[in-house]
From Swiss-Prot:
Annotated substrate binding sites: N113, T163, K167, R285, H317, S369
Species of origin: Bursera inaguensis (Elaphrium inaguense)
Cofactor(s) required for function per UniProt: Mg(2+)
PROSITE patterns: RUBISCO_LARGE (PS00157)
Residues at the catalytic site: K165, H284
Quaternary structure and interacting proteins, as annotated: Heterohexadecamer of 8 large chains and 8 small chains; disulfide-linked. The disulfide link is formed within the large subunit homodimers.
Cofactor stoichiometry and binding remark: Binds 1 Mg(2+) ion per subunit.
Entry binding sites for Mg(2+): K191, D193, E194
Name of the protein in its database record: Ribulose bisphosphate carboxylase large chain
Lineage of source species: Eukaryota, Viridiplantae, Streptophyta, Embryophyta, Tracheophyta
Protein encoded by which gene: rbcL
Length: 465
């Protein structure tokens, strides 16, 4: 019959070092730590097999299809410098293995069962190359950076936000008051915390109403367009869309979603709704560290960031480099560029394993949030540039005089940094002087500078190259 039963080495079929990758292939870079005694070729081939067409034994039905056409192939293996028995295995997947426009299906294949595979001690997906042939099947972000700036009429500077704290426990009316004070003081956005959905102390509909009132009142007073990220995340997709519909009916400019806990299917549905109805979409990455914080196992955040750009979102949290949460500078800037730019060159020093061409898929604004305050403003302005959202939760609400003065302090600091940069000053070197000079003209900023003059969160990053 030509069918030979039994178990054979994966590497006989799935390790193909001579393979020349196609422009339509999805390419993956895995950090593979094999069990002792398992050769790297076998481990790399096993990853390619188990995440595509393979199973543990030869099966009769293999003969009914063309495996050569559909199989994943491990086409290159390189040892990781400084690590014993660890390799970067490159795998190419034919495009036909994936459903069009479905991040869910892409991840089910590439990071599915294979991560529980016994022959591997650990496995981490470091990067994915999404070919234009596949990215073109996605809508992507509902609006993108340029359209958002046009909607908000704000140019030439980062946008300012603030997460309303305490994150849980406020009534809807008091929550709306906090939103109003921040927006009136000079912020562009305020934000629902990611855990605020619809709890007994504050149901979603009440919150939406009071926040809408805060938005329109502060807009009328300041003459600027304002927004509040209304968290539409819910227990079912239907409920989530219902909340987004209500936000649109109130005239709110932006809604929010927790894309990892909510799931990619829900996120893509919401992104489609947002584009059809002119809502911006803010994405929070709650749960990302469960997946991306271990260096040897899981998935790097740059992969989750690429997946979000496909699934759809106009903002996404991307670490701060300087605040209280994980993030190394070069690596963070690597995935920040992957979110914003049309074309990103391969650059291993920034953790970018593949050249990525997004072919005019709209960009996503990175959001810096978590333990940042006015003294960080020069560094943030320099590191993230204009196309970003800088979010100060405690750094606004913790101001000794209250929310509105806290917002004023942040806005004055930001405008001072942008002006200094435009005049050609070096923010990295002169940052503290720039803030000090500005605080002479702004008592609010001076008070903020005094409160946070010594606060730092300095720990070694877990996830290095």
């Amino acid at each position: 019959v030509g069918f030979k039963a039994g178990v054979k080495d994966y590497k006989l079929t799935y390790y193909t070092p001579d393979y020349v990758t196609k422009d339509t292939d999805i390419l993956a870079a895995f950090r593979v730590t094999p069990q002792p005694g398992v050769p790297p070729e076998e481990a790399g081939a096993a990853v390619a097999a188990e995440s595509s067409t393979g199973t543990w034994t030869t099966v009769w039905t293999d003969g009914l299809t063309s495996l050569d056409r559909y199989k994943g192939r491990c086409y290159n293996i390189e040892p990781v410098a400084g690590e014993e028995n660890q390799y970067i295995c490159y795998v190419a997947y034919p495009l036909d293995l994936f459903e069009e426009g479905s991040v869910t299906n892409m991840f089910t294949s590439i990071v599915g069962n294979v991560f529980g595979f016994k022959a591997l001690r650990a496995l981490r997906l470091e990067d994915l190359r999404i070919p234009p042939a596949y990215s073109k099947t996605f809508q992507g972000p509902p609006h993108g950076i340029q359209v958002e700036r046009d909607k908000l009429n704000k140019y030439g500077r980062p946008l300012l936000g603030c997460t309303i704290k305490p994150k849980l426990g406020l009534s809807a009316k008091n929550y709306g008051r906090a939103v109003y004070e921040c927006l009136r003081g000079g912020l562009d956005f305020t934000k629902d915390d990611e855990n605020v959905n619809s709890q007994p102390f504050m149901r979603w509909r009440d919150r939406f109403l009071f926040c809408a009132e805060a938005i329109f009142k502060s807009q009328a007073e300041t003459g600027e367009i304002k927004g509040h990220y209304l968290n539409a995340t819910a227990g079912t997709c239907e409920e989530m869309i219902k909340r987004a519909v209500f936000a649109r009916e109130l005239g709110a400019p932006i809604v929010m979603h927790d894309y990892l806990t909510g799931g990619f299917t829900a996120n893509t549905s919401l992104a489609h709704y947002c584009r059809d109805n002119g809502l911006l979409l803010h994405i929070h990455r709650a749960m990302h560290a469960v997946i991306d914080r271990q260096k040897n196992h899981g998935m790097h955040f740059r992969v989750l960031a690429k997946a979000l750009r496909l699934s759809g979102g106009d903002h996404i949290h991307a670490g701060t480099v300087v605040g209280k949460l994980e993030g190394e500078r070069d690596i963070t800037l690597g995935f920040v560029d992957l979110l914003r730019d049309d074309f990103v060159e391969k650059d291993r020093s920034r953790g970018i394993y593949f050249t990525q061409d997004w072919v005019s898929l709209p960009g996503v604004l990175p959001v810096a949030s978590g333990g940042i305050h006015v003294w960080h403003m020069p560094a943030l302005t320099e590191i993230f540039g204009d196309d970003s959202v800088l979010q100060f939760g405690g750094g606004t609400l913790g101001h000794p005089w209250g929310n509105a003065p806290g917002a004023v302090a942040n806005r004055v600091a930001l405008e001072a940094c942008v002006q200094a940069r435009n005049e050609g000053r070096d923010l990295a070197r002169e940052g503290n002087d720039i803030i000090r000079d500005a605080s002479k003209w702004s008592p609010e900023l001076a008070a903020a500078c005094e409160v946070w003059k010594e606060i730092k969160f300095e720990f070694e990053a877990m996830d290095t190259l």
